[in-house]
Amino acid sequence: MNEYIVSARKYRPMKFSDVVGQDALTTTLRNTVKSGKLAHAYLFCGPRGVGKTTCARIFAKAINCEHPTDNGEACGACESCKAFEEGRSFNIFELDAASNNGVDQIKQLMEQTRIPPQVGRYKVFIIDEVHMLSQQAFNAFLKTLEEPPAHVIFILATTEKHKILPTILSRCQICLLYTSPSPRDPKTS
């Protein structure tokens, strides 16, 4: 029997060039990878289903790629890329704040920031639905965000930017994602 895979995961873009409708963001992220001038925190904002988590994962992979392409894409062949694609990366952590929103989960995650990366240059922490964190969790996270280790990059994703503390927002590079306009049907145009 074949293993069932949700189509959204099966067909999830694996590189910037596969992402549809976010050209401004993917160009910016590619240029960031090419230049090597990374912020220590990014906040991806936009409605549900526009690709915030997908772009965060692609960016995390590209950040740690040992041989990025000339246009800022991950090579897909180095040990770091393979480990990420196979789900065995020790340097990229994902937390779904919708179901792990307590102070204990954030403190556990922040403990991981102390340990330098084993493969690749950075430890990347993706916190999805970051607006769901409790007040205490936000405060615990803020301590690390204020003075992060040099080997740590945070990528936060949210549908509700207004629920995030201003002190968190001020420490992030904000990246907006938009819904793509529906393709027009030539028969009705």
How should each PLM-predicted stretch be described?
Residues 178-189:
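Single conserved hydrophobic/aromatic residue that forms the stacking wall/gate
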